[in-house]
């Protein structure tokens, strides 16, 4: 069905169920139908929001006052409790069922990892400095310093690992401004690399705030949080929600390059294993960790 066609509109308004990974699932025009639905003008079908990641920050636009849903699928227990208690939906709307896409992630995640470290920082919002001004940001300077760190390069050689730098897709327009002097460090983008495959292949994840860390934790791989610009990040990005990285995170929080490299070396020395403390947090955060998420979601939709 061609998006935005008459047939698309016809099917959209006649469907019994509208199921998708984003709000206003299956809508011919997401933003138009989002605003129409907020005013009570919406399709007759049951609205099912599968989600494509775990919510951790405050997202006012997903509250009931701005969004109608019949089923709000949650991927983690604390996320479900946060949405249930603060987003204003009827008690039966949010359900902890697990993310549908994680069934395949868990199956594929049984394969051995590569000796690869994935460095994946997230974006900084639509109003972050652009062009030449980008080089003056803490994001650029911290990431560039790490990519060219002799200490990192020596570590990669010593432990026979590579590092793949894959910034958020909204930051990849700046990728040409980064450079490295090590043959073991790769600058990657969405044209040449698949995110899901990178997450499966990596032995360890370094990120700042990217929610991909939930995927890596779900696979019980070690991760490090390199939060070099916390105050600046909150200025341009979402406000913090229920998730506290130091209390709830699945790896240590590092605010300096030195602390990050010390934590990285310790993890390399330990054979790239997730420490027991963080495995326990993972188990508490994802009590449903099997390959039955799709089945649970299907049953929930049938019960609407």
Language model segments and positions:
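C-terminal alpha-helical cap of glycosyltransferases
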Residues: 289-304
């Amino acid at each position: 069905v061609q998006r935005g066609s008459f047939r698309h509109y016809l099917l959209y308004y006649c469907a019994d169920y509208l199921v998708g990974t984003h709000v206003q699932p299956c809508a011919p025009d997401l933003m138009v139908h989002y605003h129409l639905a907020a005013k009570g003008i919406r399709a007759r079908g049951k609205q099912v929001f599968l989600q494509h990641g775990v919510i951790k920050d405050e997202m006012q636009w997903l509250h009931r006052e701005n969004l109608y849903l019949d089923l709000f699928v949650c991927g983690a227990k604390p996320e479900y409790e946060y949405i249930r208690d603060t987003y204003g939906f009827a008690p039966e709307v949010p359900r902890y069922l697990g993310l549908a896409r994680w069934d395949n992630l868990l199956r594929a995640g049984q394969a051995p990892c590569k000796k690869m470290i994935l460095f994946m920082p997230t974006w900084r919002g639509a109003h972050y400095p652009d062009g030449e001004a980008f080089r003056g940001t803490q994001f650029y300077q911290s990431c560039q310093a790490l990519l060219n760190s002799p200490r990192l390069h020596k570590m990669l050689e010593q432990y026979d690992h590579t590092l793949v730098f894959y910034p958020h897709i909204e930051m990849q327009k700046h990728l040409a401004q980064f450079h490295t002097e090590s043959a073991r460090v790769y600058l990657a983008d969405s044209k040449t690399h698949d995110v899901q495959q990178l997450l499966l292949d990596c032995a360890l994840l370094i990120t700042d705030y990217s929610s991909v860390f939930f995927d890596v934790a779900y696979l019980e791989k070690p991760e490090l949080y390199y939060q070099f610009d916390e105050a600046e990040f909150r200025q341009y990005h979402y406000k913090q929600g229920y998730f506290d990285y130091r209390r709830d995170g699945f790896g240590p929080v590092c605010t300096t390059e030195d602390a990050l490299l010390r934590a990285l070396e310790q993890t390399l020395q330990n054979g790239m294993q997730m420490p027991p403390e963080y495995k326990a947090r993972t188990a508490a955060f994802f009590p449903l960790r099997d390959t039955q998420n799709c089945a649970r979601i299907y049953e929930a939709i049938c019960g609407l």
